[in-house]
């Protein structure tokens, strides 16, 4: 096996993992020192062996210092799995300057050329609190299943955005990364979830599911991030099924709005299409909307994916999100999100047969209490 890389001193990157020779695993990358990147994982053996795991990025140290990026996972040779990417480091908090950004997650390594799964992408680091919030790091791309047989790696999740203690805006949350493509035979990897938005901040969108190549199902899309006092983020699209056989992946659900009187639920991701034989993926559900002074709307559901050209049903549309409950006098509840459209039927099938079902609309939010001003007349008072 290749040797492991050393950890970096403060502010210094971690060392790369050593490659294997003919048979053996690649070494792991070393962790980055404060605010520095992690080292890359070593390459797996050319005949057999897994790629090494990437090192984690170092957390920021000192007011407003960003976290380091995660190291990339090492690729496999002929037979073996790719190494996972390292996680990004968290940013450092601050008072009179902006909080530090979270580091990016490292990409997963590719699977073996004959057999092996791709490595998972690392997760993004969390943005820090400051006068302006730090941005959350994006997740790392999932590694591809490159060979005859292998599943794509899952995409990394986005990091949470940092909150703010002053007029500048909160930090934007990190995006979920796309899942890796499947090998000649194998499923696509799932997309990563988007990061949660800080209060009033932009939430991260979900990553797309990876596509299958010849035989296999598309990966599911990642969920959109939740937020408060701002919109929920959209879910990621499902990956396409294999060119010969396989279902499309389901779309990720939209992010919810958990508090506040602004913002609507995120849209559900669209389902992936089947190509020749297989069913389309279901659309993701729209995000729900929590209570507000005036009820806001739930998110729309995603459309279903198309059925295969030779055989397969279209995917069902995703249901709409729940509308928000209104509070206070005379306020109106939010509207439920629209359901997604069903996916298309195969072109040769009889009209209407094989199409996906449309998603149901989301429930409407409840209304606020009736006004008590001016006070109502007593029931015993005669009315002229």
Which residues does each PLM region occupy?
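Long, compositionally biased tandem-repeat segments
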Residues: 1-384
């Amino acid at each position: 096996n290749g040797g492991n890389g050393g950890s970096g001193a403060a502010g210094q990157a971690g060392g790369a993992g050593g490659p294997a020779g003919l048979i053996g695993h690649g070494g792991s990358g070393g962790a980055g020192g404060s605010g520095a990147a992690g080292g890359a994982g070593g390459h797996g053996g050319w005949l057999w062996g897994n790629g090494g795991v990437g090192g984690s990025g170092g957390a920021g140290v000192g007011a407003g210092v960003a976290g380091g990026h995660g190291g990339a996972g090492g690729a496999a040779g002929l037979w073996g799995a790719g190494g996972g990417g390292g996680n990004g480091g968290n940013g450092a908090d601050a008072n009179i300057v902006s909080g530090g950004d979270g580091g990016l997650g490292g990409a997963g390594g590719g699977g073996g050329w004959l057999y092996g799964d791709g490595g998972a992408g690392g997760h993004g680091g969390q943005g820090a609190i400051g006068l302006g919030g730090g941005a959350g790091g994006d997740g790392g791309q999932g590694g591809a299943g490159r060979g005859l047989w292998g599943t794509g790696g899952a995409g990394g999740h986005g990091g949470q955005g940092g909150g703010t203690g002053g007029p500048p805006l909160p930090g934007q949350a990190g995006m979920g990364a796309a899942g890796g493509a499947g090998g000649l035979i194998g499923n696509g990897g799932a997309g990563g979830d988007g990061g949660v938005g800080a209060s009033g901040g932009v939430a991260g969108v979900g990553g797309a599911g990876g596509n299958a190549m010849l035989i296999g199902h598309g990966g599911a899309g990642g969920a959109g991030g939740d937020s408060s006092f701002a919109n929920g983020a959209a879910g990621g699209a499902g990956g396409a099924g294999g060119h010969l056989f396989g279902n499309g992946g389901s779309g990720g659900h939209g992010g919810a709005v958990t508090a506040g009187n602004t913002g609507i639920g995120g849209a559900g991701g669209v389902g992936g299409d089947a190509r020749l034989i297989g069913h389309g993926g279901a659309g993701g559900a729209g995000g729900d909307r929590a209570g507000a002074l005036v009820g806001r709307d739930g998110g729309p559901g995603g459309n279903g994916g198309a059925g295969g050209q030779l055989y397969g049903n279209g995917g069902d549309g995703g249901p709409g999100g729940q509308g928000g409950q209104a509070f206070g006098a005379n306020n109106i509840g939010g509207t439920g999100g629209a359901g997604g459209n069903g996916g298309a039927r195969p072109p040769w099938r009889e009209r209407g047969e094989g199409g996906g079902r449309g998603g149901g609309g989301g429930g409407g939010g409840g209304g606020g209490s009736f006004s008590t001003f001016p006070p109502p007349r007593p029931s015993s008072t005669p009315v002229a």
